[in-house]
């Protein structure tokens, strides 16, 4: 069941505008306009990481199944355990990460 949920989520991510993917840190990572915003674990089928603004990250961490992700990476990432979080809820966090990445992309082009 975990796989099916993750596949559904990946499919939704792939269809967002300006999204591309490449492997990074053992994750299948997706970027929006060149800024990474989500990664799907290749080791287990229930872990995803999402890049968020500091405020939104703090909001996310208060939820069941969500914790800070700091695998040698910069702060600003969360890890979601898909065994504890509904796909629809996870996708809401993914969309927040996507919008954050698009905002970062616009800032770096100024």
Predicted feature residues:
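Charge-dense, helix-prone N-terminal extensions
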Residues: 1-110
């Amino acid at each position: 069941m975990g796989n099916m949920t993750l596949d559904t989520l990946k499919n939704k991510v792939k269809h967002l505008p300006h999204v591309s993917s490449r492997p990074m840190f053992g994750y299948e990572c997706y970027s929006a306009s060149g800024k990474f915003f989500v990664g799907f674990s290749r080791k287990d089928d229930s872990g995803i990481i999402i890049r968020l603004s500091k405020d939104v990250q703090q909001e996310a961490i208060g939820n069941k199944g969500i914790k800070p992700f700091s695998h040698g990476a910069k702060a600003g990432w969360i890890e979601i355990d898909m065994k504890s979080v509904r796909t629809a809820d996870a996708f809401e966090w993914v969309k927040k990460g996507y919008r954050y990445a698009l905002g970062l992309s616009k800032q770096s082009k100024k």
